[in-house]
Design a protein with these regions (language model features):
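ATP-dependent adenylation/nucleotidyltransferase module used to activate substrates
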Residues: 1-181
């Protein structure tokens, strides 16, 4: 007979076992989207089910202008699990690529010079420019996150750090492409 097939959940649990065994510093990047939400919940469930006595770092880049339902979801998950999460909610005016302006190549969330038109206030407990000595005005959002990873590793005095990012690799595999070209 053939091998017993494992499902995605079982394989994820095996990987989490290795991660939580091998790394002293684990950080999940959580945008509030489906992929990062599933990953964060898998980690939360793993910690609780295995009764681990450690906290999980969560890195959330708060872009100021987000759907209210996404903000509510992020707030709800972080609050409900604050006993096991060490949250780094980042509200920094790094550069962010934009395609909504003919005049600007980028915009800045939480730009202090534009405070009068902010969509909302900085959430309580968020980390701002003052918390990050490596931040510069020239920094792009993804450049910031690379520096953040090094900063967190040093701050935690970690031996081995693991940064988890939930990204779908295959979507909608049940759909089929038409066999004849469209006319």
């Amino acid at each position: 007979m053939g091998e017993v097939q494992k499902n995605v959940y079982e394989l994820a649990q095996e990987r989490l076992h290795i991660i939580f065994k091998e790394f002293d510093n684990i950080c999940v990047s959580f945008s509030g989207g489906k992929d990062s939400g599933v990953l964060l919940n898998l980690c939360i469930d793993y910690i609780r089910r295995n009764n681990l006595k450690r906290k999980l770092s969560v890195y959330h880049m708060d872009y100021e202008i987000q759907y209210s339902m996404t903000i509510d979801y992020v707030d709800r998950i972080l609050e409900a699990n604050k006993d096991i999460l060490e949250v780094y909610r980042v509200c920094v005016p790094f550069k962010v690529t934009t395609c909504t302006s003919m005049y600007q190549n980028y915009w800045r969330p939480w730009d202090p010079e534009m405070r009068d038109i902010w969509v909302r206030n900085i959430p309580e407990g968020s980390m701002t420019v003052e918390n990050f000595p490596f931040y510069t005005d020239a920094m792009w959002d993804y450049e910031f996150q690379m520096h953040f990873a090094k900063w967190l590793h040093a701050r935690k005095d970690a031996v081995r750090s693991c940064f988890l990012i939930g990204i779908r690799t295959v979507s909608y595999t049940h759909l089929t492409l038409p066999t004849t070209p469209y006319v």
